[in-house]
Amino acid sequence: MFCIQCEQTIQTPAVKGCSFAQGMCGKTAEVSDLQDVLVYSLQGVSYWATQAHRYGIINDEINQWAPKAFFSTLTNVNFDPERILQLTSQAAQFKAQLKDQVLTASSLANSPLSEVPAVAEFELPENAQAILAFAPQVAVNRGKESVHEDVIGLRLLCLYGLKGAAAYMEHARVLEQTSNDIYAEYHEIMAWLGTDPEDLGELLDCSMRIGLMNYKVMEMLDHGETATFGHPVPTAVNVKPVKGKCILVSGHDLHDLEKILQQTEGKGINVYTNGEMLPAHGYPELNKYPHLVGNYGSAWQNQQKEFANFPGAIVMTSNCLLNPNVGQYADRLFTRSIVGWPGVAHIEGDDFSAVIESALAQPGFQHDEIEHMITVGFGRNALMNAAPAVIDQVKQGNIKHFFLVGGCDGDKAERSYYTDFTEAAPEDTLILTLACGKFRFNKNTFGDINGIPRLLDVGQCNDAYSAIQLALALAQEFDCGINELPLTLVLSWFEQKAIVILLTLFALGVKGIYTGPTAPAFLTPNLIAIIQEKFDMRSIGNVQDDLNTILAA
């Protein structure tokens, strides 16, 4: 195996990347190798989908399936080798189908194809053993013996960025938001990466193209969520348990949460959100259910302890999943969509009766704990409605600076930086936050500035789109560029969604972003230097030193 896509990958002076029997995330070498073959197969599918598009052939089923399958290889999503093999087999079938259609269309048009790349001609071996034997040939760092390490690094930046965008495409698709133009662009990029490009300039340009494409995807996802569930409104959420039977919903999928809420009505079951599902409470069409009683737990890395202590059924709708056998709760855990763990029950479709049965069989919480309320729901509409009041406070000198502090959380001790940063931020500053990094500080008290809360929870990781809209509105009001605003982004990364959001911000021209806790292992020192120079990206350091630098600018 060789996997270097997440922040927790092995990174020592001698070794970079997970290349032993098991990755740091818990996936086996077998699963990692099968995922490499799946990605290579999907690049072949994208080649033929791109050619098909040129002949006016658009296959909605394949367009919608391909990013979803790619999503299954994102960190902490699918650990089940059988499921990965099924996806790879499906990719081979779709590739053959598209190839036949393209060759027929090409013959009818008397326009033979130019040279077909190896990734498009690849034939999947007949059995799992043969597939695993083939896997080293399509490892994500293939060609490392003859290709400069900077080329490998930029290929991976593009691949992982596109993987993050594919995840958001799937989240949007679940809410019936699709775009043939975006699918076409996705396939073009995926197919091109399958040809193992070597030009550094083209690869860097490709990363920016991915960032801009993802901006459109986030816009599409924002529309899907708000059209379906209403615009988020500031809402108080209890983060302590209440007495009763219970179901915990983790991941990102609001559609699944809605179905669970509908199917548990009148059954005496309380529903809790976990992790990135916390922002669900701000959506009117979800918050209207009285048995959506609160949020349980914190960020993904704590789930083995928190899930073990949860006395009900648990549904994992997307990333991030950890080994459920550690806390011995695998028998009451259910996976959805592209999520998988060997031996864990998987739910197809929208019937959650098995989850409800499991919840009723568990003891549930035996008593109410004292309420602790936090506020969520400062999405795009709420932020834009508050913009005039915020602008007025800026003009009066009561708000001196804005910080966006958020992103993925993780285990490393260095991540305490983000807690310390928010606590040290002066009282005349506003802090926007999003994604699971917020759990480092979202239960703390920050007060307000003349009625405007100093901590504004914007939502999930994809709700970076909302923060961008506020920044654009402020820039327009003050007649300046985004980089001239008293606004600083302080981001934490862990996996590929965070990578593509960073690419989106770069592509939109946002500079001076602070990132941490460590640099991606797949980026060489030279590439990091290039990115720092081109985008003025900064690494987090000492909290007070960083604050002094930011506020003195």
UniProtKB/Swiss-Prot annotation:
Binding-site residues, hybrid [4Fe-2O-2S] cluster: 252, 276, 320, 408, 436, 461, 495, 497
UniProt-recorded Gene Ontology molecular function terms: 2 iron, 2 sulfur cluster binding; hydroxylamine reductase activity; metal ion binding; peroxidase activity
Pfam families attached to this UniProt entry: Prismane
Listed Gene3D superfamilies: 1.20.1270.20, 3.40.50.2030
Binding site for [2Fe-2S] cluster: 3, 6, 18, 25
Binding note for cofactor: Binds 1 [2Fe-2S] cluster. Binds 1 hybrid [4Fe-2O-2S] cluster.
Catalysis performed (reactions): A + NH4(+) + H2O = hydroxylamine + AH2 + H(+)
Subcellular location field: Cytoplasm
InterPro entries in alphabetical order: HCP/CODH, Hydroxylam_reduct, Prismane-like_a/b-sand, Prismane-like_sf, Prismane_a-bundle
Enzyme class per UniProt: oxidoreductase
SUPFAM superfamilies to which the protein is assigned, alphabetical: Prismane protein-like
Modified residues (Cysteine persulfide): 408
One GO term describing the cellular component: cytoplasm
A biological process term (GO) from this entry: response to hydrogen peroxide
EC identifiers of the protein: 1.7.99.1
Protein keywords: 2Fe-2S, Cytoplasm, Iron, Iron-sulfur, Metal-binding, Oxidoreductase
Cofactor: [2Fe-2S] cluster; hybrid [4Fe-2O-2S] cluster
Family: Belongs to the HCP family.
Role description: Catalyzes the reduction of hydroxylamine to form NH(3) and H(2)O.
HAMAP family named among the record's database cross-references: Hydroxylam_reduct
Full protein name: Hydroxylamine reductase
